[in-house]
A protein has these predicted regions:
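Short, charge-dense linear interaction motifs
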Residues: 2-248
Length: 248
């Protein structure tokens, strides 16, 4: 009977000790959590503000490549030059001036014959190519020409169309305007958050500017390094700022 009493007594002691340990641990944990909230409160509130605007490309770069494979380099050069002339005529007839067209240098390389995975050292054909690049502010003209380039290809000219790159030259002007609007947006957000908990927004203690994002109008793309879509004439330009405010 005494042995049973001793066992129950030891269980009671262990239970009390465990309760003390748990209470101490919880107390320490709550103290740490409380300290964390206090630190966050003393640092104020950090919010992200954003602003966007619609923009239209005012510059375009369009590169076309005329490429031909022929038995000899000479034959390839002749055909490529003929193709370049046809492409140039198409561009000029469509409203592009000669001054807006740049012809790249001719490039060629020999295609070797291979047998059983080994080169025989014999050249069986030559690939010759030349770039035709348009640089202009006539973005609408280039858009129309790019849609009709198929007529040149249908005529037998071997053209590789890399597609126009539509660019905005006024980004340096848009950036400060957008950042100012993003700052206002950040303050509105901070005031809404602090008002909900009975506080007020104080002075700005830190500002970090984000990268500019240039995207298609319906895009949600956002890259850490910044996005710059060149596939469309119409674009959306977005700026963000991260702002820390004191709170009261």
């Amino acid at each position: 009977m005494s042995e049973l009493f001793d066992i129950e007594k030891r269980k009671g002691i262990i239970t009390i000790a465990a309760a003390v340990i748990i209470s101490l641990a919880l107390g320490a944990g709550l103290n740490q959590v409380g300290s964390g909230f206090a630190q966050r409160s003393s640092q104020g509130i950090t919010v992200t503000g954003s602003a966007k605007t619609s923009a239209k490309a005012d510059n375009v770069v369009w590169t076309l490549n005329v490429s031909q494979v022929s038995p000899t380099a000479g034959a390839g050069i002749t055909k490529v030059n003929s193709g370049v002339d046809a492409v140039t005529k198409y561009l000029v007839d469509g409203g592009i001036t000669q001054a807006e067209i740049t012809l790249g240098s001719l490039s060629s390389f020999g295609n070797e014959e291979w047998q059983n995975g080994n080169s025989t050292g014999r050249i069986i054909s030559y690939r010759v190519s030349r770039d035709v690049t348009v640089r202009t502010k006539k973005v609408d003209t280039v858009f129309t020409l790019s849609q009709g380039i198929g007529s040149v290809i249908a005529a037998g000219v071997p053209v590789n169309n890399y597609g126009p790159q539509y660019l905005i030259s006024t980004l340096s002007d848009l950036r400060p305007q957008l950042l100012a609007e993003a700052m206002k947006d950040a303050k509105v957000r901070a005031e809404a958050i602090t008002k909900a908990v009975g506080g007020t927004v104080g002075a700005v203690t830190n500002v970090r500017s984000g990268v500019i994002q240039v995207t298609t109008p319906d895009s949600t793309q956002a890259l850490d390094s910044g996005a710059y879509d060149t596939s469309t004439i119409d674009k959306t330009v977005t700026a963000t700022v991260s702002v820390t405010f004191k709170t009261k």
